[in-house]
From Swiss-Prot:
Keyword terms of this UniProt record: Cell cycle, Cell division, Cytoplasm, Septation
Subunit structure: Homodimer. Interacts with FtsZ.
Compartments in which it is found: Cytoplasm
UniProt name for this protein: Cell division protein SepF
InterPro entries, alphabetized: Cell_div_SepF (IPR023052), Cell_div_SepF/SepF-rel (IPR007561), SepF-like_sf (IPR038594)
HAMAP family tied to this protein: SepF (MF_01197)
Organism, as annotated: Finegoldia magna (strain ATCC 29328 / DSM 20472 / WAL 2508)
Function: Cell division protein that is part of the divisome complex and is recruited early to the Z-ring. Probably stimulates Z-ring formation, perhaps through the cross-linking of FtsZ protofilaments. Its function overlaps with FtsA.
GO cellular component: cytoplasm
Lineage, top ranks: Bacteria, Bacillati, Bacillota, Tissierellia, Tissierellales
GO biological process: division septum assembly; FtsZ-dependent cytokinesis
Keyword Cell cycle carried by entry: yes
Amino acid sequence: MSFMNSFKKLVGVEDDYDEYYDDQYYYDESDHVESESKDYEQKQNYETKSNIVSMNNSATKPVESKPLNRVKINIHEPISFDDAPKVIDVILKNEVAVLNIEMLEKDVKQRIFDFVSGAIYSLDGKMQKVTKDIFVLVPKGVEIDGKIKDQITKNNGFFQL
């Protein structure tokens, strides 16, 4: 080993060995220093919390929905304007309705359509035209897929399963 030590002295490289390196260091509780990271975390949490906006609105009511394992579709062919509220009663039960007003006179069709479309709008439901005088009405939270309409128009007005 002396050869290595003499070679290191000749080159000018010395060991960086510290005599105090072997001493045991005992942690004294009086040496404890508060970390600024905790303060930073608290400030960061405070700033993050201030950016959160509540989406709850007291004016809206939760809507109870039926399980989607069974879907009931009601087909309505009203004879007069007095039958129009029955269609909306179905929507209020969170069920799907099909409105067929093909066989009615033009003025009765218009009155029923206006009543039903206004009620659907006020209930946040959706209405989609299938053919000229047939409409699908769904309550809030139900999506209408346009594939059925495409199949009916492709098959000259007939739906085939």
